[in-house]
Amino acid sequence: MKKKILQTVLFLGIMFLTFYTLLHGQNLSEIYQAVKNMSVPYLIAAAGLALFFVCAEGSMIWYLLTSMRKKTDSQTTVLCVVGKEKVCSLWRCIQYSFIGFFYSGITPSATGGQPVQLYYMNKDGNKGSDSTIVLMTVAVIYKIVLVVLGVGMLLFCGGALKTELQSFFPLYLLGLALNTVAVAVVLAAMLFPQWMIVVWAWVEKQFIRLDIWKANPQRMDKVQTFTGNYRNAVDWLKQHPGKLIVVIAVTFLQRCSVFLLTYMVYLGLGQAGTSIQEVVLLQASVYIAVDMLPLPGAQGITELMYRSVFAPVFSKGSLIPSMLISRGLNFYFLLLAGAGVTAVSYTHLTLPTT
C-alpha cells in the first residue's frame, strides 16, 4: 500500500511540476482559446489514433491467445469467465491493454503494466503459460519495431535529426541505445538462454564479492524462469511464423499511429508549411528518446523535448496548445480511460459470484 501511495504522489508531483514549468508566464487565456479553436474533425481523428494505439495491442493479445487456443483440442479449451460473463473476447483483450497502459503510465520505466495484465488474464481463466507467451511476444515485437524505426531514422535521416533535435540529439542516441540493449538482452534470453544464465551467474557473483548484493538463490530462479518463458515464446513462434508477421505488421501500424496523431493536431490548429514526414519523424524521435527513462509516463522530459523540437514547426501561439492536445490525447486521455477500465475490472473481481 505504501508503495502505491508513493508511486501516486511521485506521479502527481512530476505532473504538477511539468505543467507549472511549461505554463508559468504563459498567457493562459490565449492557450485556452487556441485549444478551443482546434478543428473538431481533426480532434476526433487524433483521439481515434490514440484509441487505436491501445486497441491495437489488445487485438494482438486476442489474436495470439485465440491462435494458441486452437493448438489444443476443443475438449481442453478454457473459457474465461468473470461472474457469468464470457470475457475471452476481443473487447476483454482490449481491456487488458488499457489496464496495462494505466499501470505502465504510473510506474517508472513502464514496468508495472505486464505483471498486472498477467494477473487479470490468469484471474479470467487463461492458462498462465499462454498468457506469459502472448505478453512477452507483444512486448518483444514492440521493442524490436521501435529499435528498427530508430536505427532506420538514424541511418537515413541522421543529419536532419541532429539539426532538428539539437541539444536533445544525445538523449535520442541514449534512448535508442537503451532500447537496443533491452532488445539484445531479450533476444539473448530467447535464442541463447544457457549463455544468459551463465553471464548472469558471473555478474551476480561479482556483485556479491563486492558486497553490493547478498547471496540470494531466488535471483537465479527468477532468471531461469525469465529465460524459460522467452524460450517457450520462441518455440511457439517458430511453429507459427505467419502469426509473427501479422503481429509485426500491426505493431508497426500501432507505432506509427501515435506519431501520426501529432500531425492531426498540426492540421487541426490550422498550421501549414511542414510535411507529414517531418512531423512524424520529430514525434518518433521524442518517443524513442524518452521511452526507457525511469520516470512515470516519461513525464516532464517528454513535454520539454516536445516544446524544443517542435518550436520551428508550430507558430508561437500554437506550440503549447499543440503539446497540451497531443500529449493530452496520447497519454492523459488514455491514462484516464485505463483507470476507468481498471476500476471496473477490479470491481468484477471483488464482487461475490452467485
Residue ranges of predicted features:
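Transmembrane helix-loop-helix hairpins in multi-pass inner-membrane proteins
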Residues: 1-29, 33, 100-213, 295, ...
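A short, hydrophobic C-terminal helix/tail in secreted or cell-surface proteins
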Residues: 350-354
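A short amphipathic helical element positioned immediately N-terminal to and/or at the very start
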Residues: 31-34, 226-238
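Short, membrane-interfacial amphipathic segments enriched in basic
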Residues: 212-228
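Membrane-embedded helical hairpins/re-entrant loop segments and their flanking transmembrane helices
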Residues: 56-98, 265-282
